[in-house]
């Protein structure tokens, strides 16, 4: 009998998975995952890879968030799972990149889309697990909310069921990484220095306090918050990226500069002085060129180390259109004039191009750059198939031998040109590349541009060319433009 009881407890003990913590972050495995997820009402899970640079950058901030929540006595837990070891779990939740964060509420997952610093993580979690705006009873509650994050927004209303209060709460519900507070108490009104109903944004930098003084609408308040939540000049980091690129302001003035440079402080001040004039219209961001991860951004703008420091402006509204200033000296006056000219629409987009190689047409696959693209691809007497690639792209490297063979196959056909262009160093005004490799067909006697969406094989490309761009074709640029216009003009009856 005793042996049976002992065996029962042994089996019971074996069935309970071991749950460990590292810096207050629960270490998840395939064995304990379901138990932990189902045993907590709220748990944020990071799916990571040990070799992932972004995961390494996130780790200390993630641990800080877990520790702070634990010290506050919160029921919200943070966990992490090594997706390279427990692949079946990450596959189940369709993890396609690292780090991927998901909040599990009573076992049901939702995507995390907040910032990567501990304040943003905590603010997002509290917003998702509690009221969209915290009720504030007195001045102490205001101070506590202000201390909880670098940026907070507080609204005072006589009646929290009023139209203005509802608008405030609707905006609060849509901004996950900023804590909001709301109150009807006179003590709160006095603490946030209001004479009547109103909204105030507090931040631990720049001017500290900004009062909303516009007509209250959802769009207006949201834009105002996004414009004022950032510093006059922000540094681009993995932590600030989601706020910078996810905000309402789509025009960004970028200063590429080394923080180790002796002229950094002066340049930052010149940049900051210019930023004051364009608050709410253009974001001013500096990119530290000493950071290895920022090399890809420099490459995107075609910048080399010997060109630094440098200013570039980008519009995210029009397929990430870039603008290059015509000045060399970085001063407040020059930056301001350039930015105003951009807003006035008098600055032409900057299109990158390498010089035309001497041997560009020596091999079966022709080499295109910005400077010879129109001449070759738009030749009305030729059917031209172009691969737009990036040197670092794995899929492009896999395609390379096939593309070379395709060039050889059609080398003697004077009506067909097989070409390629490095899109990290060359741009064409009306050809927008969103991913690599992208393959486009420029048919003879036509202004159409057709995307190739078929198999990336000799057979697939051959059939496409022999059917004059029909077999394996996606929508043409013209058809895509028409579809977009139809979508914009469509209204529900």
Swiss-Prot record:
Location of the Thioredoxin domain: 17-130, 342-470
Catalytic activity: Catalyzes the rearrangement of -S-S- bonds in proteins
Biological process annotations from GO: endoplasmic reticulum unfolded protein response; IRE1-mediated unfolded protein response; macromolecule modification; protein folding; response to endoplasmic reticulum stress
UniProt protein name: Protein disulfide-isomerase 2
Disulfide bonds: 52-55, 393-396
Compartmental location: Endoplasmic reticulum lumen
The entry's keywords: Disulfide bond, Endoplasmic reticulum, Glycoprotein, Isomerase, Redox-active center, Repeat, Signal
Motif, Prevents secretion from ER: chain positions: 490-493
Keyword Isomerase assigned: yes
Residues the record marks as active site: 52, 55, 393, 396
GO CC terms: endoplasmic reticulum; endoplasmic reticulum lumen; procollagen-proline 4-dioxygenase complex
Self-association state and partner proteins as the record states: Heterotetramer of two alpha chains and two beta chains. Exist either as a phy-1(2)/pdi-2(2) tetramer, a phy-2(2)/pdi-2(2) tetramer or as a phy-1/phy-2/pdi-2(2) tetramer.
Family under the similarity heading: Belongs to the protein disulfide isomerase family.
Signal peptide interval: 1-16
Organism superkingdom: Eukaryota
Its biological purpose: Involved in cuticle formation. May play a role in the unfolded protein response.
EC number(s) recorded for this UniProt protein: 5.3.4.1
Lowers pKa of C-terminal Cys of second active site, annotated site positions: 456
GO molecular function: protein disulfide isomerase activity; protein-glutamine gamma-glutamyltransferase activity
PROSITE patterns (UniProt xref): THIOREDOXIN_1, THIOREDOXIN_2
Listed PANTHER family: PROTEIN DISULFIDE ISOMERASE, PROTEIN DISULFIDE-ISOMERASE
Residues of the site described as Contributes to redox potential value: 53-54, 394-395
Disordered: region residues: 467-493
Consequence of gene disruption: RNAi-mediated knockdown causes embryonic lethality characterized by a retraction of the fully elongated embryo, a progressive disorganization of the embryo and a failure to hatch. Also causes increased expression of the unfolded protein response (UPR) marker hsp-4.
Primary location recorded for the protein, binned into one broad class: endoplasmic reticulum
């Amino acid at each position: 009998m005793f042996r049976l009881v002992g065996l029962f407890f042994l089996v019971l003990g074996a069935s309970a998975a071991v749950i460990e913590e590292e810096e207050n972050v629960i270490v998840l495995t395939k064995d304990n995952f379901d138990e932990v997820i189902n045993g907590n009402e709220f748990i944020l899970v990071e799916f990571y890879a040990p070799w992932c640079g972004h995961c390494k950058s996130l780790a200390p901030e993630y641990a800080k968030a877990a520790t702070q929540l634990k010290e506050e006595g919160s029921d919200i837990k943070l966990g992490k799972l090594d997706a390279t070891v427990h692949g079946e779990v990450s596959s189940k939740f369709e993890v396609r990149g690292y780090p991927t964060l998901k909040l599990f509420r009573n076992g049901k997952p939702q995507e995390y889309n907040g910032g990567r610093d501990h304040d943003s993580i905590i603010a997002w979690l509290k917003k998702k697990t509690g009221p969209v705006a915290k009720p504030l009873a007195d001045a102490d509650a205001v101070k506590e909310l202000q201390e909880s994050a670098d940026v907070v927004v507080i609204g005072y209303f006589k009646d929290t069921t009023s139209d203005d209060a509802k608008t405030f709460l609707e905006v609060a519900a849509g901004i996950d990484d900023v804590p909001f507070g709301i109150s009807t108490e006179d003590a709160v009104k006095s603490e946030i220095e209001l004479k009547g109903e109103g909204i105030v944004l507090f931040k631990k930098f720049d001017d500290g306090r900004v009062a909303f003084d516009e007509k209250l609408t959802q769009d207006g308040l949201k834009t105002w918050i996004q414009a004022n939540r950032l510093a006059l000049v922000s540094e681009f980091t993995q932590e600030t990226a989601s706020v910078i690129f996810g905000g309402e302001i789509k025009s960004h003035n970028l200063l590429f500069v080394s923080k180790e440079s002796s002229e950094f402080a002066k340049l930052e001040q010149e940049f900051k002085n210019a930023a004051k004039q364009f608050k709410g219209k253009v974001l001013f961001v500096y990119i530290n060129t000493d950071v290895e991860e920022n090399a890809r951004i420099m490459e995107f703008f075609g910048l080399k180390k010997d060109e630094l420091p440098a200013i570039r402006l980008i519009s995210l509204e029009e397929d990430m259109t870039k603008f290059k200033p015509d000045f060399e000296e970085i001063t407040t006056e020059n930056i301001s004039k350039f930015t105003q000219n951009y807003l006035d629409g008098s600055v032409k987009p900057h299109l990158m191009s390498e010089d035309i190689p001497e041997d560009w047409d020596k091999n079966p696959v022709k080499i295109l750059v910005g400077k010879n693209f129109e001449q070759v691809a738009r030749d009305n007497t030729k059917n031209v198939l172009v691969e737009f690639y990036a040197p670092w792209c794995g899929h492009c490297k896999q395609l390379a031998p096939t593309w070379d063979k395709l060039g050889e196959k059609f080398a003697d056909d004077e009506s067909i040109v097989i070409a390629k262009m490095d899109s990290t160093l060359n741009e064409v005004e009306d050809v927008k590349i969103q991913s690599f490799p992208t393959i486009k067909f420029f048919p003879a006697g036509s202004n159409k541009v057709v995307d190739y969406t078929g198999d990336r094989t000799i057979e697939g490309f051959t059939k496409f060319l022999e059917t004059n761009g029909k077999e394996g074709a996606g929508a043409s640029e013209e058809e895509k433009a028409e579809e977009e216009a139809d979508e914009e003009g469509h209204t529900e009856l």
